[in-house]
Structure formats: C-alpha cells, structure tokens
C-alpha cells in the first residue's frame, strides 16, 4: 500500500477578519475626523483657538468639548485599527484592542456605579444642570443645548422654574435691571400649536405669578425628574443601544486579537 503523506498547511492571516476590521475602522476613523473637524471649526468661529484661556472661562459645559473629545478618541482608535489591520502591524493592533478594552471596562464600571449610587448621580446631575443654568447666556452653544433639552423633555431648570433664579439675567433680586428678571427662557414655555411665530418673550415675569397660574404657560417640572422618566419609558431602547455598542467593542477586540495571533503565527513560521 502506498504510504500516506500528511500535509501541513502553513499558517496564514485570515483575510475576512483583516478586511472587516479595516473597513469598520476606516468608517470609524472618517467619522471621528469629521466630529473633530466640526469641534475645531466651532471653536474657531467662537475665537477659542486664538484665545485658549477661553476654554476655562465658561462656567458651564461647552458642548463643543463633546465633539472634540469623542472625535479625538474615535480618530485615534480608527487610525490604529485601520492601519494596524492593513499593514498587519501588531503594535497598532494591540494598542487598538487595549485602548478599546479600557473604554469598555470604564463604561461597564460607570454603569455599575450609576446603578449603585443612583441618589449621588441624581444630585450631581442636578448640580451640573444648575451650573449650566448659571452660564446660560455665556455661550450660544450651551444656550442652544439647554433650550433643546428643556423643549425635548418638557421641563424647566433642574428641579423646577425657580432654578433660573441662579442666573444673573433671570433672578428676582431688586438689583437686577434685566427685562428677563423673574422670568424663564422661551424653551420653558408651553408651545401653542396654533402659533406660527415663536414668542421668545413668553417667559417674561412668569415667576412673579403663583405656581398654579404658571402651569398653563410654562413647564413646571424639573429636567432631572423628566430625564429619569424618559429613561424609564425608553429603558428597552436605551439598553438595546448600550448592549449593541458593547457587542461591537467586544467584536473589535476579538478581531484585533485574532489578527495579532495570525500575524505572530506567520512570523514564527518564517
């Protein structure tokens, strides 16, 4: 009987995983660069790039920070994953998987802490919103963000309309010369569907009235409570999005680690 010869196949890099990782990360890289460009453009329009100290002058949150930070992280991750997969660079692939793993565990830790320390998170959210209420007129992007949140969640202030007493333009002190004294922003007003033109003065002097008289004109519930209610009403959707993001991160880590193993196996066979 003729002898049987066992054939050994040389290890090779899996093309499917390699190009899937490359394609996914090039999209991620482009989106990150776009976010970063929008953030830098917004800062340029506000003159922040020519005066870096302006970054710390704002008392509240500058929404542009979200674009810059998220865009920067996405760009770095996308670059490492894209170039690492294309050039079969194990250093970049390991950096990608470790960085992505770190982000995943930070998200997981944040989720657990938010569940365990719900009351503390609620207090911090209340403090955060009130700090931004104080800085409402200081930055147009922050102003637009607050207006959007109050209109979307049908709320006013962190715990109620009286939180606007923290703002120098809306407080009720006798020394306040502003026409907006004892008022609230227009985004607190209950919109009349029949109105074609937005009445930006609808909140003037509204807090001089009794609370029962305010109810038909402005939202009297705070944004912290309304946000919690929104989370409860949309818990399945929010949980689904978070799980999908987590699965994508785990998939990215596994693909990168598998590609590193293939590359090292090929190198060891040289």
From Swiss-Prot:
* Disulfide bonding pattern of the chain: 155-223, 156-188, 172-182, 189-202
Topological domain (Cytoplasmic) residues are: 1-19, 85-94, 256-270
Listed A to Z, the keywords are:
Cell membrane, Disulfide bond, Glycoprotein, Membrane, Transmembrane, Transmembrane helix
The main location is membrane
Cellular component per GO, a single term: plasma membrane
An example of a GO molecular function for this protein is: enzyme binding
List localization entries. Answer: Cell membrane
A Gene Ontology biological process term: protein maturation
- Which residues are reported to be glycosylated? 51, 171
Among Gene3D superfamilies, the record links this protein to: Tetraspanin
- Judging by the UniProt lineage, the source's domain of life is Eukaryota
Q: What are the transmembrane regions?
A: 20-40, 64-84, 95-115, 235-255
Q: Which residues lie on this side of the membrane: Extracellular?
A: 41-63, 116-234
Q: Which SUPFAM superfamilies match?
A: Tetraspanin
The topology of this chain with respect to the membrane is: Multi-pass membrane protein
Self-association state and partner proteins as the record states: Interacts with ADAM10; the interaction influences ADAM10 substrate specificity, endocytosis and turnover.
Q: What PANTHER family does the record tag this protein with? A: TETRASPANIN, TETRASPANIN-17
Protein family (similarity comment): Belongs to the tetraspanin (TM4SF) family.
Say what the protein does: Part of TspanC8 subgroup, composed of 6 members that interact with the transmembrane metalloprotease ADAM10. This interaction is required for ADAM10 exit from the endoplasmic reticulum and for enzymatic maturation and trafficking to the cell surface as well as substrate specificity. Different TspanC8/ADAM10 complexes have distinct substrates. Seems to regulate VE-cadherin expression in endothelial cells probably through interaction with ADAM10, promoting leukocyte transmigration.
Q: What is this protein called?
A: Tetraspanin-17
Organism field: Rattus norvegicus
Lineage, opening ranks: Eukaryota, Metazoa, Chordata, Craniata, Vertebrata
């Amino acid at each position: 009987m003729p002898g049987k010869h066992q054939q050994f196949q040389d290890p090779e890099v899996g093309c499917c995983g390699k190009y899937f990782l490359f394609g996914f990360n090039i999209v991620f890289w482009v989106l990150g660069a776009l976010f970063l460009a929008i953030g830098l453009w917004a800062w340029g329009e506000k003159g922040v790039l020519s005066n870096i100290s302006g970054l710390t002058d704002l008392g509240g949150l500058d929404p542009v920070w979200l674009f810059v930070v998220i865009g920067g992280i996405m760009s770095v991750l996308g670059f490492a994953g894209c170039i690492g997969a294309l050039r079969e660079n194990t250093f970049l692939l390991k950096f990608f998987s470790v960085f992505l793993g770190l982000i995943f565990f930070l998200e997981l830790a944040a989720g657990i802490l938010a569940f365990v320390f719900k009351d503390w998170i609620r207090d911090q959210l209340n403090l955060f919103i009130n700090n931004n209420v104080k800085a409402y007129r200081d930055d147009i992007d922050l102003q637009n963000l607050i207006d959007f949140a109050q209109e979307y969640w049908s709320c006013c202030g962190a715990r109620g309309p009286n939180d606007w007493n923290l703002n120098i333009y809306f407080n009720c002190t006798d020394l306040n010369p502003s026409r907006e004294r004892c008022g609230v922003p227009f985004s607190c007003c209950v919109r009349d569907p029949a109105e074609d033109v937005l009445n930006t003065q609808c909140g003037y002097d509204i807090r001089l009235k009794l609370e029962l008289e305010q109810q038909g004109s402005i939202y009297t519930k705070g944004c912290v409570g309304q946000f919690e209610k929104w989370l409860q009403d949309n818990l399945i959707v929010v949980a689904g999005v978070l799980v999908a993001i987590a699965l994508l991160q785990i998939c990215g880590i596994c693909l990168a680690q598998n590609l590193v193993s293939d590359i090292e196996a090929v190198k060891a066979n040289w």
